[in-house]
């Protein structure tokens, strides 16, 4: 597949996605420093300003790639709409169902959504290696979810069943849109468009779509230095820097692999909640983190042939020129 090389390039791509996931894992903890700012404002400032910064940083490349981007305008628009919907659903999910449940549902089910998209649209067949990694990661995130939800329900401020259900539903919307914009960006990149130009176009348009939401809900961000600092951090670090890294990663690994590697995010979020916010994580939660790490190891450890896995999916009927390294 064009744009997804073997060996070291795939390893570098995986590391870029993992680094992005670490940055994303800080967002839940950062948001706790601005408790008076609503989830729509947090999502709009994070992805909106972060997306516009990406567009500005990639402006020259985007202009040079404009003819090819216009030829794929449908994919660009799908990615941009998904970019706009994702943060609104994600942060609202965390506010309604809790940070643990919202993060785990949103990120933990994204690999399944990516797999469905690639199977239906690209007609790719999942391999045993990807399936094993996804099962480990989903089991780990489920344990994190159950452990932290049980711990939270033991406190005084339990959430309503209706709020939890709505929050979980919004988490599923976030997972689907995350998978969609990852797929769209990967499709543009592997179609010959430079990763910076593809990400700049998709996230720049998504940022423009989020500006009205930011104008309508963002006033509390300016009411205090802490709110402004959180907004600036969200836009610059996890969203701008994180998605630049994610774009580089998507140039070398499929969207299904990238979304599976990003299962590191809820594990990072849980650890930071313990170390920074002061939450307590039960044994089941730590077990979940270990399973997530095992999931990442399955995807990134070199195979017997000495190459790092680059595609955990194979096109049906395609006979590779050399033995595949995906364990299928």
Report the location of each language-model feature.
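Transmembrane alpha-helices of multi-pass small-molecule transport proteins
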Residues: 12, 36-85, 109-116, 176-181, ...
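Hydrophobic transmembrane alpha-helices of multi-pass small-molecule transport proteins
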Residues: 49, 54, 126-148, 155, ...
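C-terminal transmembrane-helix exit sites in multi-pass transporters
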Residues: 58, 110-135, 267-287
């Amino acid at each position: 597949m064009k744009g997804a090389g073997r060996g070291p390039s795939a390893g570098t791509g995986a590391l870029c996605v993992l680094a992005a996931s670490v940055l994303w894992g800080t967002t839940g903890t950062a948001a706790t420093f601005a408790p008076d700012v609503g989830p729509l404002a947090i999502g709009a400032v994070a992805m909106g300003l972060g997306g516009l910064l990406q567009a500005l940083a990639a402006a020259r490349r985007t202009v040079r790639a404009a003819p090819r981007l216009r030829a794929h305008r449908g994919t660009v628009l799908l990615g941009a709409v998904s970019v706009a919907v994702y943060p609104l659903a994600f942060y609202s999910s965390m506010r309604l169902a809790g940070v643990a449940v919202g993060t785990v549902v949103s990120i933990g089910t994204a690999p399944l959504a990516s797999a469905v998209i690639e199977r239906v649209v690209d007609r790719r067949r999942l391999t045993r290696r990807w399936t094993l990694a996804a099962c480990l990661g989903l089991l780990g995130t489920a344990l994190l979810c159950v452990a932290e939800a049980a711990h939270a329900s033991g406190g005084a401020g339990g959430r309503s069943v209706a709020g939890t259900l709505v929050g979980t539903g919004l988490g599923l919307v976030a997972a689907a849109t995350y998978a969609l914009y990852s797929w769209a960006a990967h499709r543009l990149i592997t179609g010959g468009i430079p990763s910076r130009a593809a990400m700049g176009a998709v996230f720049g348009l998504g940022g423009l779509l989020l500006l009205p939401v930011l104008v309508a809900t963002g006033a509390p961000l300016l009411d205090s230095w802490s709110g402004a600092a959180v907004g600036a951090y969200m836009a610059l670090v996890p969203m701008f820097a994180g998605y630049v890294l994610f774009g580089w990663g998507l140039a070398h690994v499929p969207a299904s692999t990238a979304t599976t590697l990003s299962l590191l995010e809820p594990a990072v979020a849980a650890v930071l909640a313990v170390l920074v916010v002061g939450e307590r994580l039960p044994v089941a939660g730590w077990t979940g983190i270990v399973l997530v790490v095992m999931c990442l190891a399955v995807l990134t450890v070199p195979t017997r042939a000495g190459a790092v896995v680059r595609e955990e999916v194979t096109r049906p009927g395609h006979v590779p020129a050399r033995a595949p390294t995906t364990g299928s």
